[in-house]
A protein has these predicted regions:
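Di-metal (Zn2+ and/or Mg2+/Mn2+) metal-binding site signature of metallo-dependent hydrolases
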Residues: 1-14, 81
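Short, well-ordered alpha-helical packing segments
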Residues: 11-14, 38, 102
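Active-site phosphate-binding strand-loop segment of PLP-dependent enzymes
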Residues: 18-84, 89-99
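Hydrophobic side chains within alpha-helical segments
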Residues: 6-8, 57, 83-84, 89, ...
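PLP-dependent aminotransferase class I/II
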Residues: 21-25, 30, 34-36, 43, ...
Length: 223
């Protein structure tokens, strides 16, 4: 179920299901009342994770999105707020989860862990700190390591990120106002509950299927 005003899931819907974890998508730069959702998750012992790939920089009640859950994902794919061409990031304050993510990111090895965590793992599984320890697989893993070129591109863009986010916000204001004022055709997306909207795109929710089909037809071959 979705709330068309905020482009988000309604918090009361969450209460209907017996969940162990919730992977919440902050869609297109917007979010629902995530503080309410977090309170529900805390009360019901639901692990809250944020998919923040489209909302880098959006602020809600004094906090940037991506800081409400146990962890948050960010995408640096082409077209997002900042780009490394491919790749992304996972942010967390949980040391146990961070250790697991570093292991899974690189084949299941412990090479990217600090010395203390390496020693703890090797002691737990009785692995000698020799040549063989570098080729011990502690878990199923992938090769998700970014390249130096991707990292260079990302680092170069960081100093422009604030400017990019502000420009996206300004573009959204300029484009959305005339669209949402046409209340006979479109639902207005509310963003006043946000301290800052770092949107990914301008959501257009048509009031009828006919209006939607007209827009799609006009964009054929253009987009």
């Amino acid at each position: 179920h979705a709330d068309q005003d905020h482009v988000g899931g309604l918090p009361d819907v969450l209460k209907k299901y017996n969940l162990r974890a919730l992977f919440l998508t902050n869609l297109l730069g917007f979010c629902d009342d995530i503080d309410v959702i977090k309170k529900i998750c805390d009360a019901r012992k639901i692990i809250l994770l944020e998919d923040n790939c489209e909302s880098l920089g959006t602020e809600y009640q004094g906090k940037k999105l991506g800081n409400f859950g146990l962890a948050a994902t960010f995408s640096f794919y082409v077209g997002h707020h900042m780009s490394t061409i491919e790749g992304g990031a996972v942010l967390t304050d949980d040391k146990k989860l961070a250790t697991m993510l570093r292991i899974v990111r690189a084949h299941g090895w412990d090479r990217n862990l600090d010395l203390v965590r390496q020693e703890n793992l090797r002691k737990k599984y009785k692995v000698n700190s020799t040549f063989y320890s570098r080729y011990t697989f502690y878990d199923l893993g992938y090769n998700f390591r970014t390249t130096e070129i991707n990292g260079f591109l990302g680092n170069r863009q960081l100093k422009f990120l604030g400017e990019i986010i502000k420009k996206r916000r300004d573009n959204f204001r300029e484009m959305s106002v005339p669209i949402y004022q046409n209340s006979n055709r479109y639902f207005a997306i509310k963003s006043r509950h946000l301290d800052f909207c770092s949107n990914f795109a301008v959501p257009i929710i048509c009031k009828t299927q006919k209006i939607r089909d007209e827009l799609v037809a006009k964009c054929a071959g253009i987009i």
